[in-house]
UniProtKB/Swiss-Prot annotation:
GO biological process: translation
Lineage: Bacteria, Pseudomonadati, Pseudomonadota, Gammaproteobacteria, Thiotrichales
Main function: This is one of the proteins that binds to the 5S RNA in the ribosome where it forms part of the central protuberance.
Keywords: Ribonucleoprotein, Ribosomal protein, RNA-binding, rRNA-binding
Quaternary state and interactors: Part of the 50S ribosomal subunit; part of the 5S rRNA/L5/L18/L25 subcomplex. Contacts the 5S rRNA. Binds to the 5S rRNA independently of L5 and L18.
Protein name per its UniProtKB record: Large ribosomal subunit protein bL25
Native species: Hydrogenovibrio crunogenus (strain DSM 25203 / XCL-2)
UniProt xrefs under InterPro entries: Rbsml_bL25/Gln-tRNA_synth_N (IPR020056), Ribosomal_bL25/Gln-tRNA_synth (IPR011035), Ribosomal_bL25_b-dom (IPR020057), Ribosomal_bL25_C (IPR037121), Ribosomal_bL25_long (IPR001021), Ribosomal_L25_dom (IPR029751), Ribosomal_uL5_bac-type (IPR020930)
A GO MF label: structural constituent of ribosome
Length: 193
């Protein structure tokens, strides 16, 4: 289900205008993509902070932005935070139409770690990648990709090509047609005796 956020159109741009917005409890943002010009908007910072704390999958979800003209479906493309305070300073949204492909990093959720034969034999599980870059339609964008490691033996790796992906989702690393990009995702080291 898509979350609906309220935004307002920004008329002033630049460092000073953005600073005034932040002091007023708002976050400057921009919506870009598609065949439409970029649109500068502002959102309430407490609304964004609350939503991100409650739903960490928002980074890979389609959001609806209302109040700045027509309602637009978007994904969060970039979110910038202040280095000392952690407050959100700017957000980039990319328009997400049903016909346009989006490319986004998606987290991997590893399942069955404790029941893996390699771990039961005393092997150590190593995670080489915890996120992967996928390309798909916005409506097919997964919030996470489940990786079953319950059958992984000691001394073996699970590679990108062995991941089970949702329908319509492709790994960008494998679209090159070269097996050099088929990297290991997770592996279990052999037991030393």
């Amino acid at each position: 289900m898509s979350q609906v956020w309220t935004a307002e159109l920004r008329t002033e741009e630049g460092k000073g205008a953005s600073r005034r917005l932040r002091h007023a409890g708002k976050v400057p943002a921009i919506i870009y993509g598609g065949d439409v010009d970029a649109k500068s908007i502002a959102l309430k910072s407490n609304q964004i902070e609350r939503a991100l704390k409650l739903d960490v999958d928002l980074y890979n979800s389609v959001l609806t932005l209302e109040g700045a003209g027509d309602a637009e479906n978007c994904i969060i493309k970039d979110l910038q935070r202040h280095p000392a305070t952690g407050f959100i300073t700017h957000i980039d949204f990319q328009r997400a139409s049903d016909k346009a492909m989006v490319t986004k990093r998606v987290p991997l959720k590893f399942k069955g770690k404790e029941s893996s034969p390699g771990v039961k034999m005393g092997g150590l599980m190593s995670f080489m990648q915890t996120t992967v870059e996928v390309s798909c339609l916005a409506k097919d964008l997964p919030t996470a990709i489940d990786v079953d490691v319950s059958e992984l033996e000691a001394g073996t790796n699970l590679r990108l090509s062995q991941l089970t992906l949702p329908k319509g989702v492709k790994l960008t690393a494998l679209t090159h047609g070269n097996t050099d990009y088929d990297q290991a995702v997770v592996g279990i080291s052999k037991v030393k005796r």
